């Protein structure tokens, strides 16, 4: 514990990815992807849908559709279905609530930096009892103006509360680490 405390003393703020880091959202994401691909007539037998956990939706759908209109249609179908059903099929990982409480009590600025749109992730964090621990909930935009993890991280870092602060990014995917490095 002391070693961890010494490491954390180098930071003022911590950015967290959400899916796969704080919340196990895989069941809802996978069910929603299955529904969208079925609706759009895409055969996904043999496709490991877990690989789509994390990357932006348009990037994932771009692997199956070349027409931008179809990518947008798939993205819209996904968001509509996920908001109604998939977003409720998630659970906070064990220990996350206590960790956030401890970090908040220690005075860290806590933020999210997720590829999920802010409009989508905020109600999920509220439903799971986590929103209260975050000073800023940062996510992708609904349009393509802030779609990549790098763009999301830059957006979060541009917030006034983080100016001049030493910030640590915590995530579970390569996209999280690339977004922090860029």
Residue ranges of predicted features:
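Short helix-capping segments at alpha-helix termini
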Residues: 39-43, 68-70, 106, 129-133, ...
